Curated annotation (Swiss-Prot):
Organism name: Aeropyrum pernix (strain ATCC 700893 / DSM 11879 / JCM 9820 / NBRC 100138 / K1)
Superkingdom as given in the UniProt entry: Archaea
Annotated coiled-coil segments of the chain: none
Family as reported in the entry's similarity comment: Belongs to the archaeal Spt5 family.
Stretches assigned to the KOW domain: 98-128
Protein name from the UniProt record: Transcription elongation factor Spt5
NCBIfam families: KOW_elon_Spt5
Quaternary data: Heterodimer composed of Spt4 and Spt5. Interacts with RNA polymerase (RNAP).
Gene Ontology MF term list: translation elongation factor activity
Gene label: spt5
Keywords: Transcription, Transcription regulation
Annotated HAMAP family: Spt5_arch (MF_00950)
Record SUPFAM superfamilies: Translation proteins SH3-like domain
Any single GO BP term: regulation of DNA-templated transcription
């Protein structure tokens, strides 16, 4: 083997909800049979697929042959970039500045408006002062739970 240069990614269609079980069985089978399955990925955002990294498609076939929850015999070949899109979290952090008015879109204060006091990008948190007339308070919440309000 040339150190992963020619390894490919194969998407296996499985029963939705059985991805982790299938991945575990494939890992045990690959270890027992000495198959060259380099990695097994259960994508968090896509149900019904397990992704295998292997040099030889025959190893993928041997690892999945006869498994109960595998729906299709022929796996889909994926490019590295496609796998990275599935695995890498895409978090869009809004650009917030102190003094800006935001709406809280999740959590205990959902639906309330607040004014930004401080933004901590490294921790992914924002400190806000709630603007509700009956409920004046300061809270530190995750930055992905707020959305800027156009004034």
């Amino acid at each position: 083997m040339e150190g992963g240069v020619d390894a490919r990614f194969y998407a296996i269609l499985v029963t939705s909800g059985a991805e982790v079980n299938v991945a575990t069985i494939i890992a045990e089978r690959a270890r027992a049979l000495g198959l060259d399955i380099r990695s097994i990925i259960v994508p968090p955002r896509i149900k019904g697929y397990v992704i295998l990294e292997a040099h030889d498609p025959g190893d993928v076939y041997d690892a999945t042959r006869g498994l109960r929850h595998v729906k299709r015999r022929r796996p889909l070949i994926l490019k590295f970039e496609e796998v990275m899109k599935l695995v890498k979290p895409e978090v869009e952090i809004p650009a917030l500045k102190p003094g800006q008015v935001v709406e809280i879109v999740a959590g205990a204060f959902k639906g309330m408006k607040a004014r930004v006091i401080d933004v901590n990008q490294s921790k992914g948190q924002v400190t806000v002062s709630l603007l509700e007339p009956l409920f004046r308070a300061t809270a530190t919440i995750p930055i992905d739970e707020v959305r800027p309000v156009e004034e």
